[in-house]
Design a protein with these regions (language model features):
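Polyanion-engaging groove/track-forming segments
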Residues: 101
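Long, low-complexity, Lys/Arg-enriched
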Residues: 1-91, 105-246
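Short N-terminal targeting/anchoring amphipathic segment
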Residues: 90-98
Length: 246
């Protein structure tokens, strides 16, 4: 635990080098770890068991196992986001040196998006003339990696995506305005104005939708006479999966 009462929580995908999971937990004084693996009984099971056996030496480290598709970027991002949000009162670290390449990518993206700390555990291999891996890897001190901010969609943009998704991916503008009014996104901002006109509501909606359509390609706006509809694009669906509901 840190001086400020925050737990040191680790997300650690389990690969075939179990010490790259356990050594950083010990050296970085972990309080809790989420072990990420594919299935309960797959080829990596024995390595998960090795990690658990090693952690028995450190009973203060709480362990929780998470099962997910390690080759699905979006599933990994969704789960990592959920963990970071659930542990937002703590300091979350992500091991990007273990698991699959996809979990490493998801780990780095998660850290940049949701302010966790990534680290890499290098392995020192002894010099040998034989082309075979050593029986036991020597894990050096983990290296904390730099992270940079990623521009995330605004909250109201995510609300629009969520509303459209729940409506089946398409909605008339008038219906969307009603939903956004209900959510408090479209509202009368000047109390000196007595009447909140239809034109004013459409103007506020346009401010939200224009960048979503023209810059991000999250939605498509189609007009047919006086009837206008807003539909969710594949890019918008992907954004909702990555960034989550507001």
């Amino acid at each position: 635990m840190t001086n400020f009462g925050r737990l040191r929580v680790h997300i650690a995908p389990v690969g075939f080098q179990f010490r790259r999971v356990t050594e950083p937990l010990v050296k970085m004084l972990a309080d809790k770890v989420y072990l990420v693996t594919y299935r309960e009984n797959d080829d990596a099971r024995k390595f998960v068991d090795q990690v658990r056996k090693e952690l028995q030496k450190y009973p203060h480290v709480e362990e929780q196992t998470i099962y997910l598709n390690l080759w699905d970027l979006y599933e990994c991002l969704e789960k990592f986001r959920q963990i970071v949000f659930n542990e937002k009162q703590n300091h979350v670290f992500v091991n990007v040196s273990t698991g699959t390449k996809i979990t490493s990518i998801a780990g780095m993206l998660s850290c940049m998006l949701w302010k966790a700390t990534p680290y890499y555990a290098p392995v020192a291999y002894p010099k040998t003339n034989e082309a075979q891996p050593p029986p036991t890897e020597i894990v050096e001190d983990p290296e904390v990696l730099p992270v940079y901010d990623i521009n995330k969609p605004k909250r109201e943009s995510l609300q629009v995506l969520d509303i459209l998704n729940k409506a089946g991916g398409r909605m008339r503008k008038a219906q969307l305005i009603s939903e956004l009014e209900r959510a408090g996104v479209i509202r009368l901002k000047d109390e000196s104005i007595v009447k909140f006109t239809k034109a004013a509501k459409h103007s506020q909606l346009r401010v939200i939708l224009d960048p979503m359509e023209l810059e991000w390609n999250y939605v498509k706006v189609e007009s047919n006479g006086r009837r206008s509809e807003v539909s969710l694009t594949e890019q918008g669906i992907t954004a909702l999966r990555i960034f989550g509901t507001p």
